[in-house]
């Protein structure tokens, strides 16, 4: 009887361990994906006016579906759809890529020109390597990190 009780106790312990570890309660730390809240950091009229809902990413224009610095995304902002360029995210990236306090984006037009005339925060120097694509965004940036 004691062996049966010991066996049942170990079974209860194992089943409790499996039930606790079968799922994670913390969110995964990824850069920018669908439904991620972002912060518009240029001085465009659409991004600088307050609104009761923050802008959210509704599509990432790459294969993996996770946007990093330099990727284009589609935003839902104030009831409109606008393209944006990611200039900073919260997830720690590769070496020599800074980690920001928020997911920062710059609004761009369909042809790649920025909507605003000034970027309020420093942007990573890793965007300078992609100068041909985003030369006008780099031209309105004041500081680089």
Swiss-Prot record:
GO terms for cellular component: mitochondrial inner membrane; mitochondrial large ribosomal subunit; mitochondrion. CDD domains: Ribosomal_uL14. One of its GO terms (molecular function) is structural constituent of ribosome. SMART domains: Ribosomal_L14. InterPro entries: Ribosomal_uL14 (IPR000218), Ribosomal_uL14_sf (IPR036853). Component of the mitochondrial ribosome large subunit (39S) which comprises a 16S rRNA and about 50 distinct proteins. Interacts with MALSU1. This is Large ribosomal subunit protein uL14m. It comes from Mus musculus (Mouse). The lineage of its organism: Eukaryota, Metazoa, Chordata, Craniata, Vertebrata.
